[in-house]
Amino acid sequence: MVTVLDLVNQGKRERHPEKAHRPDNVVLKKPEWIRVKAPVSRGYSETRDIVRSNKLVTVCEEAGCPNIGECWEKKHATFMIMGEICTRACAFCNVSTGIPTALDPNEPENVAKAVKQMGLTHVVITSVDRDDLADGGAQHFAEVIQAIREATPATTIEILTPDFLRKEGALEVVVRARPDVFNHNLETVPSRYLKVRPGARYFHSIRLLQRVKELDPTIFTKSGIMVGLGEERNEILQLMDDLRSADVDFMTIGQYLQPTRKHHPVIRFVTPDEFKSFETIGRTKGFLLVASSPLTRSSHHAGDDFAKLRAAREAQISARA
């Protein structure tokens, strides 16, 4: 069966040589509730042309996002800065690993130009991990934010960052640039980190999110996880509590989909009813917003969700008055 991943990655370079030594894993047949349209619309083509003309990289393509057809049709895209090669090799991720190239000094301007051309009212900026850089790419993030502010002042900006592990002062640089939403994904529960996200540290990520709120309480904080990686339900509920202890506003929960046979296998497909229950529980735990469904991804419907976040915060402030 041809999938969206096949169409997106067709004709591209060979991916994941660092995973070539791993044994093949079984790819489970997807259930009926995980179905997406192939990306063939006119809007999709126009978005692709804008991305190409500005020499930009998107996580939509690099990560093989199943929602690329829907989002690009609406001219929504998540720009991935600092190149297309990551310094880490997470077992779930479709982004290539290796030795990255030097930062492109024109990238901030090119991203801002694309945001203006696409008429975006809300933009999401993410990046590969750049452990090779002294600041993990923090200053580059700040320059991209500044360039967008100058080109389209009304556009709200959401960033999805790496963990800046062992990069002292990096987080402060990014927060001073004042993004509207600071997202850093936990990805999975702590018991799965060694197999799924071995280069990261769970409680460092929790502390990172907490520190954002300490530095600037007006910035919305956000984090997401994938399910179906072998986690237990009670572990997800504990993770929710950990995020709330860090005063995180918004949580996303989506189904893990295995990019290739060399990636971590899908242990099971979580049902839509289970996703709905996670959303309900998350709201009772105090999140301003919870997005939970099989195809939920960090940047999916990000603009609409930002409007909901603002409304929820305003309602919360009014209730306390």
Curated annotation (Swiss-Prot):
Keywords: 4Fe-4S, Cytoplasm, Iron, Iron-sulfur, Metal-binding, S-adenosyl-L-methionine, Transferase
Organism from which the protein derives: Brucella anthropi (strain ATCC 49188 / DSM 6882 / CCUG 24695 / JCM 21032 / LMG 3331 / NBRC 15819 / NCTC 12168 / Alc 37) (Ochrobactrum anthropi)
Disulfide pairings: none
Signal peptide (residue range): none
Gene3D superfamilies: Aldolase class I
Binding site residues for [4Fe-4S] cluster 2: C86, C90, C93
Residue ranges the record marks as coiled coil: none
Domain spans labelled Radical SAM core: 72-288
Entry's family note: Belongs to the radical SAM superfamily. Lipoyl synthase family.
Key word Cytoplasm present: yes
GO cellular component, one term: cytoplasm
SUPFAM superfamilies in UniProt: Radical SAM enzymes
Chemical reaction(s) catalysed: [[Fe-S] cluster scaffold protein carrying a second [4Fe-4S](2+) cluster] + N(6)-octanoyl-L-lysyl-[protein] + 2 oxidized [2Fe-2S]-[ferredoxin] + 2 S-adenosyl-L-methionine + 4 H(+) = [[Fe-S] cluster scaffold protein] + N(6)-[(R)-dihydrolipoyl]-L-lysyl-[protein] + 4 Fe(3+) + 2 hydrogen sulfide + 2 5'-deoxyadenosine + 2 L-methionine + 2 reduced [2Fe-2S]-[ferredoxin]
Cofactor comment text: Binds 2 [4Fe-4S] clusters per subunit. One cluster is coordinated with 3 cysteines and an exchangeable S-adenosyl-L-methionine.
InterPro entries per record: Aldolase_TIM (IPR013785), Elp3/MiaA/NifB-like_rSAM (IPR006638), LIAS_N (IPR031691), Lipoyl_synth (IPR003698), rSAM (IPR007197)
Enzyme class: transferase
Cofactor: [4Fe-4S] cluster
Record PROSITE patterns: RADICAL_SAM
Pathway per the UniProt entry: Protein modification; protein lipoylation via endogenous pathway; protein N(6)-(lipoyl)lysine from octanoyl-[acyl-carrier-protein]: step 2/2
Transmembrane segments: none
Residue sites binding [4Fe-4S] cluster 1 per the record: C60, C65, C71, S299
Entry EC no(s): 2.8.1.8
Cellular compartments annotated: Cytoplasm
Descriptive protein name: Lipoyl synthase
A Pfam family annotated for this UniProt entry: LIAS_N
GO molecular function terms listed in the Swiss-Prot or TrEMBL record: 4 iron, 4 sulfur cluster binding; lipoate synthase activity; metal ion binding
Domain of life assignment: Bacteria
